[in-house]
Amino acid sequence: MKRAILIIASILGFFSVLIGAMGAHYFSDYLVLVDRVNTFETAVRFQFYHTFFLFFLGLSYDFTNIKLLRYAFLVCVTGIILFSGSLYVLCLTNISFFGIITPFGGILLMFSWLIYLYSLMK
């Protein structure tokens, strides 16, 4: 599982850089037109921040509660998908419905940090 966490963190890190570059170069005119540049940058930034969090989870695997660490990992990945993913879709389609999903992803991201904290204290 440790290796899987680090691999998924690497993949998500790669995609955060790729998506950020696409937003800056390929989608920039459209994002300006629909006034979603800041929203897109927030999605990329949060994905990138939580990629590092996933690396910490993977590197913590040997000295913390493995069951809780797995929960933190799954909750974090789900949070990234819901938070950043919904913002990416919102920005690129300009369909406001996807904005409803974003807070649920944010809550999961916060919850993943709390699960990790609890795993360290246990």
What are these regions (language model features)?
Residues M1-K122:
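Polytopic transmembrane helical bundles with strong interfacial aromatic enrichment
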